[in-house]
Amino acid sequence: MSEPLKPRIDFAEPLKEEPTSAFKAQQTFSEAESRTFAPAAIDERPEDEGVAEAAVDAALRPKRSLWRKMVMGGLALFGASVVGQGLQWTMNAWQTQDWVALGGCAAGALIIGAGVGSVVTEWRRLWRLRQRAHERDEARELLHSHSVGKGRAFCEKLAQQAGIDQSHPALQRWYAAIHETQNDREVVGLYAHLVQPVLDAQARREISRFAAESTLMIAVSPLALVDMAFIAWRNLRLINRIATLYGIELGYYSRLRLFRLVLLNIAFAGASELVREVGMDWMSQDLAARLSTRAAQGIGAGLLTARLGIKAMELCRPLPWIDNDKPRLGDFRRQLIGQLKETLQKSKSSPEK
């Protein structure tokens, strides 16, 4: 049997057209625009370390505030007044042939000259530190640049500042690897992979040595005051040593401020990182039960010294970290624990003999 025909259905709305994707208009760039093109830099810094990193950056980057300018202006006027008064006293002493007063003026001139020299030296170190921060920003821009011509001169300047001789094997390999067709990003990248690791390896060795000394000193010393003085002195030496390796000098005030702020940030903002880095090894190997309280304090002091060295290393480097080459506390943790265990075993075996 045939089925009956269905009635007609009328639709009031028209048929909907299929949506078509809208294409953007084609954009063409000239050769000059393509050379100056640079992608936006992405900040890959972890959010949990933002406060600590910003505080330590402020310690190394000198600030320019209105109060500082006013103080500097007042000191300049005071210095000019002292110089003018000294010249007047010298002229009067010479005219009256007052040799005692003339000798006092000469001694005062020597003291003022020494003070001016110290101020100039401190200003020069602060200026050099500020230039290092600018160089790191410039290197970050070159690592994202496709232009040609600036990378080689920039890297040669960095090598000269670091005291790397032209005949150094790493620098010779870099010269052999670069050619005229490479852009600044490739040239600076090759320098970061061939030459910069030479200085980084020296800085890592210094951090390991100072951290090991701090660990052993705290572990074997019974005097807390001596421990504090030793750690403070060695950490200041570590900062100076790392800065010297990278070709810069830290000023007196910036060095002390860096040391204070880094310790504060390590003790508070960096506590979570220390627990994350060290907690697993301590729990897995049951080191908390094997080591004494002084030994545990020694490991903590060594890790604090290592973190201080890593931060000083980061802010004294002329290049930013790339390809996850930043040293971590885990790189020094096992070494410190191994050295401490060897020292404790030797100290236990020596009385038995």
From Swiss-Prot:
Question: Its domain of life?
Answer: Bacteria
What residue intervals traverse the membrane? 70-90, 100-120, 213-233
Q: Identify one Pfam family in the record.
A: DUF697
Location of region: Disordered: 1-35
InterPro entries xref list: DUF697 (IPR021147), UPF0283 (IPR006507)
> Is Membrane tagged as a keyword?
yes
Q: Which GO terms describe its cellular component?
A: plasma membrane
Alphabetically sorted, this entry's keywords are: Cell inner membrane, Cell membrane, Membrane, Transmembrane, Transmembrane helix
Chief place of localization: membrane
Instruction: Provide the family line.
Output: Belongs to the UPF0283 family.
Please give the NCBIfam families that the UniProt record associates with this protein.
hyp_HI0043
Kindly provide the name given to this protein in its UniProt entry: UPF0283 membrane protein YcjF
Which organism is the protein's source?
A: Salmonella choleraesuis (strain SC-B67)
Q: What is the lineage of its organism?
A: Bacteria, Pseudomonadati, Pseudomonadota, Gammaproteobacteria, Enterobacterales
Q: Which gene encodes it?
A: ycjF
